[in-house]
Amino acid sequence: MAPVTPDAVNARQQRPADPALRRLMHPHHRNYTASKASAHSVKSVSRCGKSRSELGRMERVGSVARSICSRHTRHGVDRSHFSLRDFFRGISANFELGKDFLREMNTPIHVSEAVFLPLSLCTLSPGRCLRLSPFGHSLTLGSHCEICINRSQVHVPQEFSSTQLSFFNNVHKIIPNKTFYVSLLSSSPSAVKAGLSQPSLLYAYLVTGHFCGTICPIFSTNGKGRLIMHLLLQGTSLHIPETCLKLLCENIGPTYELAVDLVGDAFCIKVSPRDTVYEKAVNVDEDAIYEAIKDLECGDELRLQIINYTQLILENKQ
């Protein structure tokens, strides 16, 4: 066993017995007063450059930022003297630290926000659904929407991933798409040919009807002879799921402008072609489809609905 030197004995005798005084002498305590030797050491370290000390300070800020959530969870409030300014300074200096902090969060920063009509659908943030009602309109995170959660098992046809594939598989199905074709023919005989040369119109009708229920399309023309489609949905409220918005914006958003508005007592999704972009047509037998549509029988209720909605669209333009 090594002999105990007198200096070691003196040092032990000078150490305070009170634990509180021991903490005051610890270098990490806030009331600790550095000795001349420790001050000399700090000066020698500072010669390494300001950048290293700044990096060390940011690392300390980062270590506190990583534990800020856990402190709030354990104690209910933040008991440290760590300011928000220091926190955001550390986040801005270390991008990875910011991502780590977001991973520790239990709830999203922004779940829902109010929106106003008319609203462009292609400008909405991805992963959100649209809820419209007489009490207000909101854009809600799909994972926090009870309607989207309850309808998460809704089957989405694989053909919806392609505009042209959906058009090719459904353009000859006259009876299932009777409302689309009757409205197209009611607009004008030439509108049938124009509608068949714009596959995105039938695609938008199929996707919107699949997710939003019964709809009635009304057609009009722009100044260049291209068709504009108004999809009217009856009811006091409307929910457009995030999957529906994603399919519409990704597949026809580059060539068509998509907007939702309130026309009279009905919600309306307007599908209008962009002026500088043209879509690729799909080769189909237009004459055979026209003959099938011309002889199509439909009830007076559907014809009256198309007439009323057409008048409503014309009045809304004025």
Curated annotation (Swiss-Prot):
Record's subcellular location: Host nucleus inner membrane
GO-annotated biological processes: viral budding from nuclear membrane
Keywords: Host membrane, Host nucleus, Membrane, Metal-binding, Phosphoprotein, Zinc, Zinc-finger
Post-translational modification: Phosphorylated at serine residues in the N-terminus. This phosphorylation regulates the localization within the inner nuclear membrane.
One GO cellular component, as annotated: membrane
Gene Ontology MF terms in the entry: zinc ion binding
Superkingdom of origin: Viruses
Pfam families: Herpes_UL31 (PF02718)
Zn finger (CCCH-type) location: 129-239
InterPro entries: Herpes_UL31
Role, per record: Plays an essential role in virion nuclear egress, the first step of virion release from infected cell. Within the host nucleus, NEC1 interacts with the newly formed capsid through the vertexes and directs it to the inner nuclear membrane by associating with NEC2. Induces the budding of the capsid at the inner nuclear membrane as well as its envelopment into the perinuclear space.
Protein family (similarity comment): Belongs to the herpesviridae NEC1 protein family.
Subunit structure: Forms a heterodimeric nuclear egress complex (NEC) with NEC2. 4 NEC further associate to form dimers. Interacts with capsid vertex specific component 2/CVC2; this interaction directs the capsid to the host inner nuclear membrane to initiate budding.
Name recorded for this polypeptide: Nuclear egress protein 1
